[in-house]
Amino acid sequence: NPEVTEKTGISSFQLIEMVVKKLKPSMIIMVDSLATNKKEYLNNCIEINNTGIIPGSAIKDNKKIDKNTFGIPVIAIGVPLVLKIDKDMYTTPNVGEIIEMTSSIISDALNDLFF
């Protein structure tokens, strides 16, 4: 997320790296927005995988967060919130509402899974 680096001077990867070194968790659950070039995916699905994620890959940040990098399982959850067409990126006017709704769905699912 470019805002993380912009506001803190630290990339998402660096923040996660510091937390993992300090707290030594048994798993990373990474949630991030995704860019898509298919309009039918925009605000319309949730991607879940165990192969990791590259936060900021749409803006050419390419440090992968995965089991090989950190030595612990990584569950990556991505939501396509940005439509990428050529070099331009677009969001819908109601992206804030979509984030609120989607974050509720994801957090409820994680709470049901772990608690």
Model-found features: residue ranges?
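Short, flexible loop segments at boundaries between secondary-structure elements
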Residues: A58-L81
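Short helix-loop-beta-strand segments that form the rim/entrance of peptidase-like active sites
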Residues: N1-E3
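C-terminal functional extensions of proteins
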Residues: I77-F115
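Short glycine-rich substrate-engagement loop in P-loop NTPases that contacts/grips substrate
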Residues: G9-F13
